[in-house]
Every structure is written in C-alpha cells, then in structure tokens.
Amino acid sequence: MLTAHHLDVARRHDTILRDLSLSIEPGRVTALLGRNGAGKSTLLKTFAGELTGSVAPHGVRVTGDVTLNGEPLARIDAPRLACLRAVLPQAAQPAFPFSVDEIVLLGRYPHARRSGARHVIAHRDRDIAWRALERAGADALVGRDVTTLSGGELARVQFARVLAQLWPDHDATESGPRYLLLDEPTAALDLAHQHRLLDTVRAVAREWQLGVLAIVHDPNLAARHADTIAMLADGTIVAHGAPRDVMTPAHIAQCYGFAVKMVETGDGTPPVMVPA
C-alpha cells in the first residue's frame, strides 16, 4: 500500500495538512474530494514524493510517515520511484513541439536500457506506448504536434503517458504493487471523455492491481467511478469510505459548505447529489 500516517505539511507559517492518515490500496480507486485550497494537490504531491528530500520546495515542512509498499518513501531514489508510481499533474502543457508519440514514450524512460549516458528505447517500449494510446482513446492523435492539440486532446495524451509508465512488463526491474496519482484528470474533458477516462482508470486498477488516487471536482463523477471516497477539509480527512456511505448531505456540507440533497437513481449506483 501507499500510506500516509499522522502526516503534517506546512508551508512557512501555514499548516496545509494536519495529522492526516490515508492508505491507497492496490486494485482500488480512491477519489479525493474537497473545496479549492483544501490541500488535495499537496496531499497528492506528498504521496508522489515531491515534498521531501532534495526536491522539497523551500519553506515546506513535512512530518509523519509516508511509505510505499512498506518502505519509507523518502528512501526510494528517483529512478526506482518512477517505476513504482506515475503522476498526472494538473498542468502538463509541453513547452516544445514534441510529437504525441514522443510524449507518451517519455513514460517508458524509467524502464529503458541505459547505454552510457543515453536511454535506449526498445521496440517493446514503442509497442507499449502505442497500446497505451489506444487504451487512452488517443491513438488517432499519433504524429500530431502536441502544441496544436486542444486541452482535452492533450489530457488524453498525458493520460496515455502515465499508462505507458505503469504498463505491465515482464522485463520490469521493480516488482510489487504500483500506484497512479491523478490530479484533476477530467478537468479538460467533455462529458463522454470524463466517463471513458475514469472507466479506464477503474479497469486498469483491477487488471494491473494499481492503487489509484484521483482528485476529482465533481462528487457525482467520483461516486460513480471510485471504490472509495476521501473527503478533505481543514487539512484532514473528515469522511472516508464507500461512496454510498460518504456521499451524504452532512458530509458534503462539512466538506464544501454547501447544502445538497441526494436523489436515488434506482439502478444500483450511488445517489446523485443536487442542490438543496
């Protein structure tokens, strides 16, 4: 598991996360909900290993324990960590005119054979990149300059990149559960692509036994696709569990400061949240 235990994160004089404990389980999708500024991205970055060690931003203090498969996250070097977890950040706009293929192949660099100072991308890696593009519904974009893509098209390409990074590979040097961290993966997508992406996330979590943490702004979308929902408010988890148990008017009011009512759909899926 990927676990935070009694986690505190502060930036200068501001406490962002306080005494927070949360585990991301292999084979399951955890959706993280919370209002703007609640600390969701900070928690995801902590799980990603971006706030500790030499990469920690100036003025950020992290206390508590974060472990990946039982090993302290801070002790895992960057090459190993890149084989064990992939991160899709909010803003992933390339500054240079790479092709779609090149962006997705970046996901294979942690696994590539080294020849001196160079990484050698094998035919197997190119095949995995192509299959990842297909799985992400972005194969029609192959060959395009990424600077010409729409926001939604680029989001699907970047999703393919993280799929390629974690794609099951019998020649992989690292074994054990792996983890996918997604920061608002559906923000740039239309309605159909939002559901397709999260359907794919849930499918690969099952098939590859990935532990997934996804920040999602639409509680209804999260409830439909996640196995577990964690609600963040005032720097800590205020509700955690199955969508049907967590998605209540009281929890939504505590998390968002907004009154809602729940409407049953009658099809066995969690109730839908609407304004009260």
UniProtKB/Swiss-Prot annotation:
An example of a Gene Ontology cellular component annotation for this protein is:
plasma membrane
Task: Provide this UniProt record's keywords sorted from A to Z.
Answer: ATP-binding, Cell inner membrane, Cell membrane, Membrane, Nucleotide-binding, Translocase, Transport
UniProt xrefs under Gene3D superfamilies: P-loop containing nucleotide triphosphate hydrolases
Q: Which GO terms describe its molecular function?
A: ATP binding; ATP hydrolysis activity
- The principal location of this protein is membrane
A Pfam family cross-referenced in the UniProt record is ABC_tran
**InterPro entries listed in its UniProt record:** AAA+_ATPase (IPR003593), ABC_transporter-like_ATP-bd (IPR003439), ABC_transporter-like_CS (IPR017871), P-loop_NTPase (IPR027417)
Positions contributing to ATP binding: 34-41
According to the lineage, what is the superkingdom?
Bacteria
SMART domains (alphabetical) = AAA
Tell me its EC number(s), please. 7.6.2.-
Disulfide-bonded cysteine pairs: these are none
Protein location: Cell inner membrane
Q: Where is the ABC transporter domain?
A: 2-259
- Specify whether Transcription is a keyword of the entry: no
Q: What does this protein do?
A: Part of the ABC transporter complex HmuTUV involved in hemin import. Responsible for energy coupling to the transport system.
* Similarity field: Belongs to the ABC transporter superfamily. Heme (hemin) importer (TC 3.A.1.14.5) family.
Record's protein name: Hemin import ATP-binding protein HmuV
Q: What is the lineage of its organism?
A: Bacteria, Pseudomonadati, Pseudomonadota, Betaproteobacteria, Burkholderiales
Whichever gene encodes this chain, its name is: hmuV
